[in-house]
Each structure stands twice: as C-alpha cells, then as structure tokens.
Amino acid sequence: MKVLLVNGSPHQHGCTYTALAEIAHTLQEEGIDSEIFWIGNKPIGGCIGCHGCVKLGKCAFDDDPVNAFTAKAKAADGFIFGSPVHYAAATGNMTAFMDRVFYSDGCGKGRAFYLKPAAAVASALDQLNKYFTIAQMPVISSRYWNMVHGFTPEDVMKDLEGLQVMRVLARNMAYFLKCKAAGAAAGVEPPKTERAILTNFID
C-alpha cells in the first residue's frame, strides 16, 4: 500500500514539507509506503474549460506537474494534500493544480481517486476537502484540525501538538487502508454507483 503526499508549497523543504515528512515517518512505522510529490515553484495555469481531457483522458496541457501526478495517482492507495495558506486559502498554484487534476481525471473517466481515502494538511481544510468529497473519496481525520504552525521548518518542529496531529492522521490513514484491504479480501464490494444527476438550480 502506498500514500502520495502532495507538497503544494513553493518551498520544497519548508513548513508543509516538514508536516508531510512527519506523516511519512509514521506511515512507515505502520508498514505503509509513501512518496512526497512536490508540485514545484513554477507557475501552474488554471483550467480553461477546453474539455480536451474528455478526448485525451488527461489534461490537454502537458507542461507542468498535473499529468505526471495523475499518472502516479492511479497506482496510489491514498492521498494527503498539503498547502501553506495564502490569504485564508491554499496557494494559487495548489488550487490550479487540484482543479486540473480532479477535473481532467473525472472528465477523462480516469477514476484515479474514486473511493481512495484522502486528507488535507492546511488551514484551508474546507476548501481542499471539497475536491475529495466530489470525487467520492473518504476523508481521513485526525484528533484536531490537520495543520501545523510556524514560519520556518524549525518552528514547525516546536509545534508538538501539530506534529502529534500529523502522526494521528497518518495512523488513521494506515488503519483505513488496512480495513479497506481486509474488506476487499473478504469479498466486500465497493458501493454501487449511480449516474450523476446534475442540477442547475434554474429549472
């Protein structure tokens, strides 16, 4: 089993990385592999609604980390997305990245995320969790909000409560993945899916 940890910070080894590294260490203790995927610090454009992903099965733009991540996501069993908070929300790059990752996978019928557990590590939990619920991903919690505090990685290492929250999150993720694997081995089928009913709130 493997969990992809997404570092949405423009700083490769900053505070967000420090939180994800704490999670990775605890996952390893639980027998779960992990990989930290950094989205980089170059500009990532937002979705332009071209619907090229419907035909291609991936985003039409191939000059940034979006398609590379989605390809990795197909083989992953769970996800944790981390982002610093810029103006009460995730970074612009992280938002554009997740918009295109989830939209292109959904429209391209990729199902890289369907029924796979996910969690967000950021003060912008509600914003990031919306991606998971739309993609029908079980959302993994901890014992408090999934966040750490500090201006530097050294500050984060002093946030003992925040680091504990990261460890609890990792153990909860590991527990869910093991339960999911045990259920599959026992013959428990995924829930039946229905064709989406789209309401435009006009008619």
Language-model regions, residue ranges each:
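Residue-level recognition of beta-strand->loop/alpha-helix junctions
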Residues: N7, W38, R143-Y144
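Cysteine-cluster motifs in flexible loop/terminal segments that predominantly coordinate metals
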Residues: K42-K74, L198-D203
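N-terminal beta1-alpha1 ligand-phosphate binding loop
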Residues: K2-E30
